[in-house]
Amino acid sequence: MELKDYYAIMGVKPTDDLKTIKTAYRRLARKYHPDVSKEPDAEARFKEVAEAWEVLSDEQRRAEYDQMWQHRNDPQFNRQFHHGDGQSFNAEDFDDIFSSIFGQHARQSRQRPAARGHDIEIEVAVFLEETLTEHKRTISYNLPVYNAFGMIEQEIPKTLNVKIPAGVGNGQRIRLKGQGTPGENGGPNGDLWLVIHIAPHPLFDIVGQDLEIVVPVSPWEAALGAKVTVPTLKESILLTIPPGSQAGQRLRVKGKGLVSKKQTGDLYAVLKIVMPPKPDENTAALWQQLADAQSSFDPRKDWGKA
């Protein structure tokens, strides 16, 4: 195996401390990350930097590497390498020395199968009105960079322009293939999953594919019937309140709910009778006339009965 100059790869000196080397690693990992860099050899450079960091970040591996680098031009280097404790290794053990020092990036790396990158999930808030049509959205997320030990070393900001299809529902997952973390040893990238969260609406509640809206009406509108303007997701409509309507009554407006590929829901107007403010003398007299005319009506007649 070729003995690479890891210090040159990292752009540091052999005398630099771990903090300096770590700073260089983060800078280069960000620069050559395949999802960020436009350079044609970015992936190869990224793996080379990761390989150098794996060795130089470990005190024992770095010491062994330094000793091997010091003897790299020794004619005996290919036949015998003297470890710090005096133990000798012949050419048969040479590959094992490299494997013990360089870990995943030496002999073992040739034996490891390709591994798929990690998937990433992010939540995307969508307004109810936006579910009616396909729309574009710019999303930003952090792409984790894993070190040789499977730990997150840093996170690289990434921005994508995506299309949110019409008819998305709360909790729906949208897959963006290959936008997760990079694979290992030629494996495919992971995916990015957008998890849709329908933002709460000040007027509408979601019930499956249907919508509910509370419609305030006056006592006389409920009693006599009326036509009132009610908003929907697209436009306002004129809703007919039947005479004798009750509080809590649900009036169905067909086809004004949520839209999906399979079906279109309905809008349900839930009536809420709102009393006027404290009446003046004239208004109180009118209420009294109504009470006298309906003296036989007892709203609590069947109260508590099954």
Swiss-Prot record:
Keywords: Chaperone, Cytoplasm, DNA-binding. It comes from the Bacteria. Transmembrane segments: none annotated. InterPro entries: DNA-bd_curved-DNA, DnaJ_C, DnaJ_domain, DnaJ_domain_CS, HSP40/DnaJ_pept-bd, J_dom_sf. Coiled coil: none annotated. SUPFAM superfamilies: Chaperone J-domain, HSP40/DnaJ peptide-binding domain. Residues 5-69 form the J domain. One of its GO terms (molecular function) is unfolded protein binding. GO terms for biological process: chaperone cofactor-dependent protein refolding; protein refolding. One of its GO terms (cellular component) is nucleoid. It is found in: Cytoplasm, Nucleoid. DNA-binding protein that preferentially recognizes a curved DNA sequence. It is probably a functional analog of DnaJ; displays overlapping activities with DnaJ, but functions under different conditions, probably acting as a molecular chaperone in an adaptive response to environmental stresses other than heat shock. Lacks autonomous chaperone activity; binds native substrates and targets them for recognition by DnaK. Its activity is inhibited by the binding of CbpM. NCBIfam families: PRK10266.1. This is Curved DNA-binding protein. The gene is cbpA.
